[in-house]
C-alpha cells in the first residue's frame, strides 16, 4: 500500500470535466509572459496553456509559473510546442511574432509576421474552433486582419488588443496633469495602435464635464496648456520604454488581462479594440482599427457609434488608408 493509498480513501469516481475557462497564450516572450501572469493574478482561467517554438524557454517559463502555483487559484498550467495542448480554449491570445530589425521596413516586418501567422492561426483553429482570438502581436491592426482572413472566423471572434493600452496611457498622463486617478479621467484613443492613432478630444471629460468646453483649443495649435503634448507622450511612450529597458511588457500584459476579463466574465464593458471598421466613419476599405466596442462571452458584441468631429474623422480615414496601403501588398 502506497503512502497516497494510506492517506486517502476514495469515495466516488471522479468524472472528467473539461476546463470551462481555458486561456492559451501563444508566444512566451516578454509580452506573452506579462499577459500570462496578469491573467493568472486576476484568476481569469481554470487552465492556462502556453505555446512557443523555443522549447527550452517554454519549459523554463512553465516550470517557473508552476513553482508558484501555491500562490495562485489556477493549478493547471501546461505548455508544449504542439498545439494539441491548447485544445478547447475559450480565449487564445497571440503575442508571437518577429521583432523589427534595425533598418527593416514595416512592410517587410509585416510579411515576416504573416508567414508566422500562416502556421499559428490554422493550428489554433484546428484545436479550438470555437475560441475567441485575441491578437497582440505588432503591427496589431494589420495582423488582426491577417488572423481574421486566415482563421475564417466571424469578425466578432477576432479582436486586436488595439488602442486599449494607448487609451490607458492617455488617461494616466491626463491624471498626472490634473492630479486625479486615471479611472476618473475619461478619454479615448482610436484608430491605429501606433503613430497615426487619433485622440478624441471632443469626448475628453472628468465627471461628465467636457474639458473642451472649458478649453476650446484643447488638442489644437495655440493651446496655452499644450494638451496636444499628452497625445504625443502616448505615441512616444512605447518608444521611450523600449529605449530604456529594451521592450514593453507590464502595461500591455495588464491591458490583455483587462480584455480577457471582460470576455470570460461577460462584463459587457466598452473597450477601444481593433475590429473591422469598413463602412464606419467614412472608411471604405477592409481594415481593422480601434473603435469603442462591447466585449462579452461571445466576443465583440457591439460597436459604439462615436460622434467624431470632422478633423477626427479625417484622421481616422487617413489611418485606414495607410493600413490598406500595406495590407493590399501582402500575400496571404
From Swiss-Prot:
Q: Which residues bind NAD(+)?
A: 29-57, 99, 138
Q: What is its EC number?
A: 1.1.1.27
A cellular component term from Gene Ontology for this protein is: cytoplasm
Q: Does the keyword NAD apply?
A: yes
Q: Where is the active site?
A: 193
Biological process annotations from GO: lactate metabolic process
Give yes or no: UniProt keyword NAD. Answer: yes
Q: Which PROSITE patterns match?
A: L_LDH
Q: Where found?
A: Cytoplasm
Q: How does it assemble?
A: Homotetramer.
Q: Which HAMAP family match?
A: Lactate_dehydrog
| Family indicated by similarity | Belongs to the LDH/MDH superfamily. LDH family.
Its name, as the record gives it, is L-lactate dehydrogenase A chain
What is the species of this protein? Gillichthys mirabilis
